[in-house]
Amino acid sequence: MAITYPCGRDEIMAVLPHRDPFLWLTRVVECVPGEHIVAELDVDPALPLFNGHFPEHPVLPGVIIMEALAQAASFCVLEARGAEGAIGFL
């Protein structure tokens, strides 16, 4: 499937196996498959994880940021593979 950029969650879900509540990409702004990617995550301040990290001083946990980076990298690699249909591991 040829994806044009920017693209949203429907196109992202066509490439990645991740789904809510653990899909941490909102859009891919730019991607040269196998080379580089620019992706974004819209952070909802109502996410339940902010209730405990940290109360009254919400911070997006670093592990979530790392997962978003891994998902973006996976998208870039898997998009380069085209219809091969393999799941990538970092």
Question: What are the roles of these predicted feature ranges?
Answer:
Residues D20-L60:
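Catalytic strand-loop segment that frames the active site of acyl-thioester-processing enzymes
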Residues A2-P6, A72-L90:
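Hydrophobic beta-strand-centered segment that forms part of the acyl-chain substrate-binding groove
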Residues N51-P61, I65-F75, L90:
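Compact, glycine-rich, soluble single-domain proteins
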Residues H18-W24, A86-L90:
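Short coil-to-beta-strand transition motifs
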